């Protein structure tokens, strides 16, 4: 299972989600079925990355802003609007390190 431990992991995971969301995540034969990547898990891990990038209390509003973008993107993926969802993920990527 993918582990989010650093900002570099976040960058890599954004690209991974952009490439495979919503339902094309590669099957990993060394993982159990419940540990395979899904859309929900991918976005959970993106949120973990937000916390890694902005752990300080002073950045609570930045975390909220970024999580709202992720919420919109996830909802668009769930509703089958993959192009708009991808645009929102690109927006997230562009905003993640703008202070």
Label each PLM-derived region with a short phrase.
Residues 3, 35, 58-62, 78-85:
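Residue-level recognition of alpha-helical structural elements
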Residues 67-99:
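Amphipathic alpha-helical binding modules
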Residues 1-4, 37, 51, 76:
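Detector for methionine-enriched segments
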